[in-house]
Design a protein with these regions (language model features):
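Class I SAM-dependent methyltransferase Rossmann-like catalytic core
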Residues: 3-55
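S-adenosylmethionine/decaboxylated-SAM
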Residues: 31-38, 44-200
Length: 200
C-alpha cells in the first residue's frame, strides 16, 4: 500500500494530467482527439458497428493506448472476445510505461477485455495460438513499414475484417494511407473519418 502511494505521489503530475485530460475527453468538448490518439464519435460508431456485424467475433485492437476503444468494443461484442495489444511505449502525456499500463488496466477493469503487453510484431507471432481472428483494428505504429507489415500479416493470416485508424492523416511521419493502398488497393478501402477497413 505504501509503495503504491509513493508511486502515485512520485508520478502525481503525470497522473493528474492524464486524469484531467480523460475528463476533458469524456466531457465531449475535445476538438483535437488526433493529438491525443483518440477516435471521434463518428469513427467510434463505425468501428463498433463493424465489430457487431456478426455475433461472437474475436476482435483485436493493436495499439490500444488507454483502452477506450477496446472497452467500447467489449461492451458491444456479444459472446465474443476482445483483445487489446500495447507495449506502452508512447502516450500523449509522457507517462512512464509502468504508469501508463497501470492506468490502462484501471480503465479496462470490470470489462471483458484481455490486455496483452507486447508490441505488434510479438503479437503477430503469438496470434497463431488464437485461432481465427474475425477483426483486427490497427492503431499502433503509424510508420509506413510497420503498417505495411501489419496489413500483409493480416491478409496472409486470413483475418476476417482488416481495419485501422489514421487513413488520410496529413502528419508527414504517418504512412498509413500509402501502406493500406499498396497492400489492398485504394478502391477496396472504405473510410469513415480517418478509420478504414478493407471492403468485404
Amino acid at each position: 500500500m505504501i509503495r503504491r502511494l509513493m508511486t502515485l505521489l512520485w508520478h502525481w503530475r503525470e497522473a493528474k494530467s492524464a486524469f484531467s485530460t480523460l475528463g476533458y475527453l469524456y466531457s465531449g468538448t475535445a476538438h483535437d482527439l488526433d493529438a491525443l490518439g483518440g477516435l471521434t464519435d463518428e469513427e467510434m460508431s463505425a468501428v463498433c458497428r463493424w465489430a457487431t456485424e456478426r455475433p461472437g467475433m474475436t476482435v483485436v485492437e493493436v495499439g490500444t493506448l488507454f483502452g477506450l476503444t477496446a472497452r467500447a468494443l467489449a461492451a458491444r461484442v456479444a459472446g465474443g472476445r476482445v483483445i487489446a495489444v500495447d507495449n506502452f511505449s508512447w502516450n500523449p502525456f509522457g507517462l512512464p510505461a509502468r504508469v501508463h499500463e497501470s492506468f490502462t488496466r484501471r480503465i479496462l477493469a470490470g470489462s471483458s477485455v484481455e490486455l496483452w503487453n507486447v508490441d505488434s510484431a510479438s503479437f503477430r507471432e503469438k496470434a497463431k495460438t488464437l485461432g481465427a481472428i474475425d477483426m483486427v483494428f490497427f492503431d499502433a505504429s503509424h510508420v509506413y513499414e510497420d503498417v505495411k507489415a501489419e496489413c500483409e500479416w493480416a491478409k496472409r493470416a486470413g483475418v476476417g475484417m482488416i481495419c485501422g485508424h489514421d487513413y488520410g492523416n496529413p502528419n508527414p511521419r504517418f504512412g498509413v494511407t500509402r501502406a493500406v493502398d499498396e497492400v489492398f488497393g485504394r478502391e477496396n478501402v472504405e473510410v469513415v473519418g480517418m478509420c478504414w477497413r478493407v471492403k468485404a
